[in-house]
Design a protein with these regions (language model features):
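N-terminal [4Fe-4S]-dependent radical SAM core
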Residues: 6-33, 56-96
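Short, acidic, Ser/Thr-enriched surface-loop or helix-capping motifs
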Residues: 24, 344-345
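Conserved alpha-helical substructure of the radical SAM core
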Residues: 78-192, 197-200
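Local cysteine-cluster metal-coordination motifs and their immediate loop/turn environment
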Residues: 102-112, 352-355, 390-409
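Iron-sulfur (Fe-S) cluster-binding segments and ferredoxin-like electron-carrier domains
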Residues: 110-122, 360, 400-431
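Short Fe-S-cluster ligation motifs
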Residues: 130-149, 419-442
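Radical SAM enzyme [4Fe-4S]-AdoMet core and its adjacent flexible, acidic
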Residues: 211-230, 234-337, 346-347, 363
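C-terminal accessory region of radical SAM enzymes
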Residues: 298-328, 355-403
Length: 442
């Protein structure tokens, strides 16, 4: 019996004349170009079922290192189950806290029904008291501030953070925090406060250049927002010395962005390319419901292939780290499947899906009371966290990335378990990642 075999998680992509290998277990770190001589050796090994491998050769060691070859006794499906269980039962408490349903923006594609609703004092106390009562159950705590526009309620962020930081410090548990914001209120004063609250990861959206952004992401009265956001980011770059923070600038792409990709990249590379704390991320504008997106449905991209192909031809210092991480193990898995992840609504309602809060037909899984008691419907929780093995996914190379499931909300609400992976798009991303990461050649 041969000692090694090809991994079931392998993918071979051809970018012109170049052969690229990818493995969804080793992720971006395992991407390699394969030289013609290495291809020939691999072909020869395949012909005799890997009986003639030269175990001392550099080529063999490289294939082994990137995960393309694995020991024959390795049960990779069993290994996948192990990683799924490990992910689902993470000992970290992750709370996504909606500080408000309100927003100062009216983006053309937003699915949310904005309401003048802010997080109640009972909900704030509930978060604090829940963590105080249960901190012994968790190895660490992470709070993601969400909305609406979360920075419209800085007082709530300060109040909760101060108490939770103290609780975690006394219990010797690490505490981390992030915020998803439109960037308009990311002012010098608020930045100072957020850093004191241990917010270190900032996720904000700027839709390309000034021209495209100010068409898609405007204030309630229709006023532009681009210049104000860039001003805030330049303050972080020039006046915030700490290196212990990361700013991810997301751009939601439509067909209108295709012709401006070069100027888009040059603009951000020029401003932030020399500061490693800043990175870019591109995602397609998607139809998550609501009436606004219907007005631009003809501008929605069928997939991101053309965007990835164009960006792969550009060179600069600023990187697309988050897009590269889309190829990492478990990166396509929705956090709602995790046992210890909860989304807290303004009224203390407990959800699994971040997009479910305050929407018509929402299905909370429980409620968080001011004394820290979290009453959960365990039947509802089970629907979100249930690990369902889909036969059609069992042998898929990408199953270490998605853990064999699409959107849990679709499964829970519609009783459908549909694969939403576009494999042509994945191949384009692999080819782009090989260039972006400047990977080695075997």
């Amino acid at each position: 019996m041969p000692r090694y075999k090809e991994s079931m998680f392998n993918r071979v992509v051809h970018d012109g004349s170049k052969m690229i290998i990818f493995n969804s277990l080793t992720g971006p770190a395992g991407i390699r170009y394969v030289s013609e001589s290495a291809q020939k050796k691999l072909d020869d090994w395949e012909k005799d079922n890997f009986e003639s491998i030269d175990y001392d050769s550099t080529v063999f060691k490289d294939f082994l290192k990137c995960g393309f070859l694995v020991p024959t006794p390795c049960d990779e499906k069993e290994l996948r189950d192990y990683y799924i269980t490990k992910y689902m039962t993470s000992p970290r408490l992750h709370l996504v806290v909606h500080t408000t349903r309100n927003c100062n923006f009216r983006c053309t594609y937003c699915y949310m029904n904005h309401k003048n609703e802010r997080i109640s004092k009972d909900a704030q106390d509930g978060i604090i008291n829940y963590i105080r009562k249960n901190i012994h159950r968790y190895m660490s705590v992470h709070i993601s501030w969400f909305g609406g526009e979360p920075l419209m309620e800085m007082g709530a962020i300060e109040y909760i953070s101060k108490e939770v930081i103290d609780i975690c410090s006394k219990a010797s548990r690490p505490y981390t925090s992030s915020v998803t914001t439109n960037g308009y209120y990311l002012t010098p004063k608020n930045i100072e406060t957020l850093l004191k609250c241990k917010v270190r990861n900032f996720h904000l959206t700027i839709d390309g250049t000034k021209e495209t952004h100010d068409k898609q992401r405007v204030l309630i009265d229709g006023s532009p927002t681009f210049d104000r956001i860039i001003e805030n980011l330049l303050y972080i770059k020039n006046d915030v010395p700490t290196r212990a923070l990361a700013v991810s600038i997301r751009t939601n792409m439509t067909k209108q962005h295709e012709s401006t990709l070069s100027s888009y990249y040059d603009f951000y590379n020029c401003l932030f390319g020399d500061d490693g704390r800043f990175s870019l991320q591109v995602k397609p504008v998607a139809d998550y419901g609501g009436d606004r997106v219907k007005a631009i449905e003809n501008d929605l991209l069928p997939n991101m292939c053309c965007i990835y192909d164009s960006l792969s031809k550009l060179n600069g210092k600023i990187k697309f780290y988050w897009n590269m991480q889309d190829l990492s193990i478990g990166s396509s898995v929705c956090p709602s499947r995790m046992h210890n992840k909860y989304t807290i609504g303004c009224d203390g309602s407990v959800h699994k899906c971040d997009e479910d809060v305050g929407e018509i037909g929402e299905k909370p899984i429980g409620h968080l009371y001011s004394d820290g008691t979290m009453k959960l419907d365990e039947v509802a929780c089970a629907k979100w966290c249930y690990v369902r093995h889909r036969e059609q996914c069992d042998n898929c190379f990408f199953s270490m990335n998605c853990f064999m499931e699409g959107c849990p909300k679709v499964r829970v609400y519609r009783n459908e378990n549909v694969c939403d992976i576009d494999f042509e798009e994945v191949d384009s991303l692999i080819a782009w990642a090989a260039k972006e990461l400047n990977v080695e050649t075997i």
